[in-house]
Amino acid sequence: MSTTTEVVAHHWAFAVFLIVSIGLCCLMLAGAWFLGGKARGRHTNTPFESGIASVGTAKLRLSAKFYLVAMFFVIFDVEALYLYAWSTAIRESGWVGFVEAAIFILVLLAGLFYLVRIGALDWAPARRQFDVKPTTISHANRQKP
């Protein structure tokens, strides 16, 4: 059991830390405001790239494929962290841990094969389901103008 003085000392230290942290942040913001540049020209906030005036907008619409690849990366990266944690404790986990990790890897591979199967990782245009043969019009069936 901790005594009341230890609890108060612990909370007092946290309060001092919090006050000093907030004070330091305010000091840095105030210093930047006082020491920062005060240029207020007409073209101050316009973008400038190598002396060439920009044309158009900087807002580009990206394909959803970029977001999908980013989500897949995050998902599989988190699983890599789990495998790293397992690898550090492999001796303590024994064969049971090995079997669990093997099942975990198999589930990851099944997910990866599913993503490949549905074409989520394909950057090329959609594949054709069947070949379309070009039709030929015979000269006898052609209408004359």
Swiss-Prot record:
Subcellular location: Cell inner membrane
EC number from the UniProt entry: 7.1.1.-
Transmembrane segment boundaries: 14-34, 66-86, 96-116
Record keyword Transmembrane helix present: yes
Main localization, broad class: membrane
UniProt catalytic activity: a quinone + NADH + 5 H(+)(in) = a quinol + NAD(+) + 4 H(+)(out)
A Gene Ontology term for the protein's cellular component: plasma membrane
Keyword terms: Cell inner membrane, Cell membrane, Membrane, NAD, Quinone, Translocase, Transmembrane, Transmembrane helix, Transport, Ubiquinone
Recorded topology in the membrane: Multi-pass membrane protein
Listed Pfam families: Oxidored_q4
Signal peptide, first to last residue: none
Molecular-function GO terms, alphabetical: NADH dehydrogenase (ubiquinone) activity; NADH:ubiquinone reductase (non-electrogenic) activity; quinone binding
Keyword flag Transmembrane: yes
Function, in words: NDH-1 shuttles electrons from NADH, via FMN and iron-sulfur (Fe-S) centers, to quinones in the respiratory chain. The immediate electron acceptor for the enzyme in this species is believed to be ubiquinone. Couples the redox reaction to proton translocation (for every two electrons transferred, four hydrogen ions are translocated across the cytoplasmic membrane), and thus conserves the redox energy in a proton gradient.
Record-stated family: Belongs to the complex I subunit 3 family.
Name of the protein in question: NADH-quinone oxidoreductase subunit A
